[in-house]
Amino acid sequence: MSEGVYEKFLAPEEPFPLLSQRGNFSEDATLDVSDFGCQLSSCHRTDPLHRFHSSRWNLTSCGTSVASSECSEELFSSVSVGDQDDCYSLLDDQELTSFDLFPEGSVCSDVSSSISTYWDWSDSEFEWQLPGSDIASGSDVLSDIIPSVPSSPCLVSKRKSKPHRNLDELPWSAMTNDEQVEYIEYLSRKVSTEMGLREQLDIIKIIDPSAQILPTDSEFIIELNCLTDEKLKQVRSYIREHSPRQRPNITRDNWKRSMASNGSTSGVSAHSSSNASMVSSTSSSTASTGSNSSTNISRAHSDGNLATAAERIRDSKKRSKQRKMQQKALRKRQLKEQRQARKERLSGLFMNEEVLSLKVTEEEDHCDDVDVLM
């Protein structure tokens, strides 16, 4: 490209000769681009700009609504005008007057703000490529300038999933903190849904032999420091021996999947329904029917035990309340008698009190009545 072309490109004699020839440049410094074919070249290797759905985004659809932007020394705006002989790249010089190419609120304004949001152009290193142009041949046609931008720093690389460990085979000391909490939750759910009240009490005694459980207690908190490798081994053995044989064993993976599908680990009925759905999806219809029936039998047995225990608790509470009321009435009567005796002693009116006892025989009952009014 000749020296004259560079001079005309970098320091034109008239400010923005391109605008004076083709566009209607008004006093408000707006640009009528109805005669122009403006194209904004998207940056390659830029993942956040995939929403443009193409490698080039045609701005002629915006009409006269184009974004407000000021080109810095590092950023060039590529504008192709009609025939290629009149193509110029606008370079913003600090001495030149800045003007609004694109008013705010337009589609292109959103594009400009998106570009400025994802990258700091002043800190980026660009590798300018001129495809289709031959500088050595002296061609004065500038093709689309495509900056090579580093990949966005906001993209996070996917983490490699940790290898799965079967907690049913690990000793307590080999588990991490999170694995211990997860396994305790799994055991609590399994014991509370599959076993009766007596089995639950036995497991609690294995974990903490000194635990005291009152009839009014509805839950038991398991401390992590109470468990050891030997206690966990005993608990696993007890669960294998006393778990219902007709009911398929719930593995830890199935429990985790059921909890994720329900979104909560608090509902026993929700867990039972999700487990039943998993059994029906992985086995035949006959096997699923048998497992569901055994599940219902086991659950009914557990519900019966819980109902009996609840009734005993209500009766004990009722008897305790009645006993407290009787003790309160007796204490109140004793205090009243003591208060009355103290008043009589202080008044001195009953110092010469004589108590007479009257005894009526049966013979006198048959005597004639005496009329006291006579």
Curated annotation (Swiss-Prot):
Annotated region described as Disordered, given as residue ranges: 238-343
Stretches of the chain forming a coiled coil according to its record: 317-346
Pfam families from the UniProt entry: FAM199X
Species: Danio rerio (Zebrafish)
Entry protein name: Protein FAM199X
Keywords noted in UniProt: Coiled coil
Domain of life the protein comes from: Eukaryota
Biased composition regions of type Low complexity, renumbered to the chain: 261-295
